[in-house]
Regions:
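A short, flexible loop at the N-terminus of ABC-type nucleotide-binding domains that lies
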Residues: 1-5, 9-21, 130, 334-336, ...
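Conserved hydrophobic segment flanking the Walker A/P-loop of ABC-type ATPase nucleotide-binding domains
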Residues: 26-28, 348, 356, 362-366
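The feature captures the beta-strand-to-loop junction immediately N-terminal to the Walker
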Residues: 35-37, 373-375
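Helix-to-loop junction immediately C-terminal to a conserved catalytic motif
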Residues: 50, 388
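ABC nucleotide-binding domain "signature motif"
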Residues: 56-64, 214-215, 394-404
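ABC-family P-loop ATPase nucleotide-binding domains
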Residues: 75-140
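Catalytic Walker B motif of ABC-type/P-loop ATPase nucleotide-binding domains
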Residues: 162-166, 171, 179
């Protein structure tokens, strides 16, 4: 077995239960996607599997060497590229040996990995990270470069088990294609969290995490969606039938009460005409009321049962919340000049090389709509920071009008 999850639960510090009683076995070499609504605990589950978080109860086991690519990298700021890749100690030992220090501890640390530098440079080149120093701080890389670095480490380490949390985030087209190819050909056990349908369709099994636990489907994402739709339609039909039955039960109970009231009124009038003594009339009335009460209780129990079944069905229906973004119209008139850039360029403190071989010149006006596209590390985020004033160009000038932004 490669991944075993047994009776696993996790509770937030505010006592809110995120998930409970999770059980799952992923056999060696299997490739599985973990899906579910935002906030259901997918990332927390992978962090527990990676040993970066502790469960409330239960246990997890991952066989062999495990490699984890997180969704966010802030916790690694302050580390160098070599430290992130986990090769800094080996490199130190290698350089010490090459410089004549033959202490036994260096050989033990290197562990006969004499071509560690060559292998590292090869995977960095494959992930379009050639030219990046192994001593460069992680925070000096773009979001896409950070993702590529962790994925390069995945190839460098050749692990038995891979945990990938949103690995296509920040990746450009070329980076995504390389990831798809790697996932397709690797023999490692793979567990992936992603919203990338192309990646999800490469995986032959889907496990959905929800408030009801883990439900697994034998098939890729398209198959999973089809099965979910069939299941949802069946639940919806059951719900409609139960709601119809509830309306009928309430109508029947109401009609019975009305009919009983009319019968009681007619019975009392008839008894008075026949001269039945009041004491006997009271007994007959009590008997009728008891019978009516028992019948009402039967109908009430039936109605309550149907209502509970409806509640359970509604709870079983998958959530279909959809993201909707509505930007209010700008108060600025169309065509107002917001940003004017003249021959701007930028380089970070740890580099003397400009981001762009040709300086950028452009003008932004209110009402314009632009899409900034480019490879990872081409400077898209840096350009936005220059536009908003978060960064200052190291060359050229940029002028900004007073405007708000998100």
């Amino acid at each position: 077995m490669s991944i075993i999850i047994k009776d696993l639960s996790y509770t937030h510090t505010d006592k809110e239960v995120l998930f409970s009683n999770l059980n799952l076995i992923i056999n060696s070499g299997e490739k599985t996607a973990l899906t579910g609504n935002n906030g259901c605990g997918k990332s927390t589950l992978t962090r527990i599997l990676a040993g970066e978080a502790l469960p409330g109860t239960g246990s997890v086991h991952c066989s062999g060497h495990l490699y984890y690519v997180p969704q966010h990298f802030g916790q690694y700021d302050g580390r160098t590229v070599a430290q992130v890749l986990g090769i800094d100690r080996k490199l130190t030992a290698l350089h010490a040996i090459l410089n004549g220090d033959v202490a036994e501890e260096h050989f033990a640390r290197l562990d006969d990995d004499w071509n560690i530098e060559e292998r590292t440079q090869a995977v960095l080149h494959a992930w379009h990270l050639n030219g990046i120093s192994l001593l460069r701080p992680l925070e000096g890389l773009s979001g896409g470069e950070k993702t590529r670095l962790f994925l390069a480490g995945m190839e460098l380490k050749e692990p038995d088990t891979l945990l990938l949390d949103e690995p296509t985030n920040h990746l450009d087209t070329a980076g995504r294609k390389r990831l798809y190819d790697f996932v397709h050909r690797t023999s490692a056990t793979v567990l992936v969290i992603s919203h990338d349908r192309t990646l999800l369709n490469l995986l032959p099994a889907i496990c959905e995490l929800s408030r009801n636990g883990l439900a697994c489907y034998g098939g890729n994402y398209d198959f999973y969606k089809e099965q979910k739709e069939v299941h949802r339609n069946a639940l919806q039909q059951q719900l409609e039938e139960k709601e119809k039955a509830l309306r009928l039960a309430r109508k029947t109970a109401r009609e019975m009460e009305e009919r009983k009231a009319r019968q009681n009124t007619r019975g009392e009038k008839a008894s008075i005409k026949k001269g039945i003594p009041r004491i006997l009339l009271g007994g007959l009335k009590n008997h009728a009321e008891n019978s009516s009460s028992k019948l009402s209780n039967v109908h009430a129990e039936k109605t309550d049962k149907i209502q509970q079944e409806i509640t359970n069905l509604k709870g079983s229906l998958p959530q279909t919340n959809k993201l909707k973004i509505d930007f209010n119209a700008s108060a600025l008139h169309i065509g107002k000049i917001l940003v004017t850039a003249q021959n701007i360029n930028f380089h970070y403190p740890d580099s003397n090389t400009n981001l762009w071989t040709v300086p950028l010149s452009f003008q932004l006006r209110s009402g314009n709509r632009f899409c900034i596209k480019g490879d990872n590390g081409s400077g898209k985020t840096t350009l936005l920071k220059l536009i908003t004033g978060e960064l200052t160009p190291t060359g050229g000038t940029i002028e900004r009008a007073d405007f708000t932004y998100i």
